[in-house]
């Protein structure tokens, strides 16, 4: 339920608008609402962190608006709550009016949803399922530089799940489309909410099966097999891609030791 802040409320403050997050001094604000001049704003609790409520305020601040990416190296739980806040703020901003009848909607009090009192339609936040996979060949791992990535970072392959497709089918299809290779021994590892803008990353590991590596230039700048001790620039810690790479490097090292 939303409430108007009196200034006495305390907790973590997620102030978001248009996929941006208020990060005064580069950090997520914490403490009394009055200390951050938030009295009078409309807020809604979206979770708890370290025993304190986490509040969402949907508004633009005059300065200090940044990206939730700046919180990647903080605790994973707090990063996920910040991502939830940014996604919810954008969801409510983009669902002010019903797509069926055009009437104004309001936020549900019991769940993350927008409701239309006119036609009774109910809308939920969009979540885009994505697969991401680390592929091993002996003591090597397949890494690629994506066209949308900056700074020369090399990472594992990933892509969106298509309609009517299983996760396993999506992994095999994405790998074949982007690298021209076939995989085997596919196994699920973990998942990570990824608020850029509203993805859910489902992570896998796999082994190389067959095919000659040939990258898709529309998706990748380059791709190659890298020995575990000769890796290029990698994604930052805290990302599911980095975890997949580190887990695969362990397997590559074990394979190398057994081969000696």
From Swiss-Prot:
HAMAP family: Nudix_NudC
Description of how the protein assembles with itself and partners: Homodimer.
Cofactor(s) required, per the database record: Mg(2+); Mn(2+); Zn(2+)
UniProt-annotated binding residues for Zn(2+): 98, 101, 116, 119
Binding site for a divalent metal cation 3: 174, 178, 219
Cofactor: how and how many bound: Divalent metal cations. Mg(2+) or Mn(2+). Binds 1 zinc ion per subunit.
Organism: Yersinia pseudotuberculosis serotype O:1b (strain IP 31758)
Residues that coordinate or bind substrate: 25, 69, 111, 124, 192-199, 241
Protein name: NAD-capped RNA hydrolase NudC
Pfam families: NUDIX (PF00293), Zn_ribbon_NUD (PF09297)
InterPro entries linked: NAD-cap_RNA_hydrolase_NudC, NudC-like_C, NUDIX_hydrolase-like_dom_sf, NUDIX_hydrolase_CS, NUDIX_hydrolase_dom, RNA_Hydrolase_NudC, Znr_NADH_PPase
Protein family membership: Belongs to the Nudix hydrolase family. NudC subfamily.
Transmembrane segments: none
Taxonomic lineage of the native organism: Bacteria, Pseudomonadati, Pseudomonadota, Gammaproteobacteria, Enterobacterales
GO biological process, one term: NADH metabolic process
Disulfide bonding pattern of the chain: none
Enzyme Commission number(s) of this protein: 3.6.1.-, 3.6.1.22
Gene3D superfamilies recorded: 3.90.79.20, Nucleoside Triphosphate Pyrophosphohydrolase
Position of sequence motif Nudix box: 159-180
Domain Nudix hydrolase: 125-248
Residues bound to a divalent metal cation 2: 174
Function noted in UniProt: mRNA decapping enzyme that specifically removes the nicotinamide adenine dinucleotide (NAD) cap from a subset of mRNAs by hydrolyzing the diphosphate linkage to produce nicotinamide mononucleotide (NMN) and 5' monophosphate mRNA. The NAD-cap is present at the 5'-end of some mRNAs and stabilizes RNA against 5'-processing. Has preference for mRNAs with a 5'-end purine. Catalyzes the hydrolysis of a broad range of dinucleotide pyrophosphates.
Binding residues annotated for a divalent metal cation 1, in chain numbering: 158, 178, 219
Key words of the record: Hydrolase, Magnesium, Manganese, Metal-binding, NAD, Zinc
A Gene Ontology molecular function term of the record: NAD+ diphosphatase activity
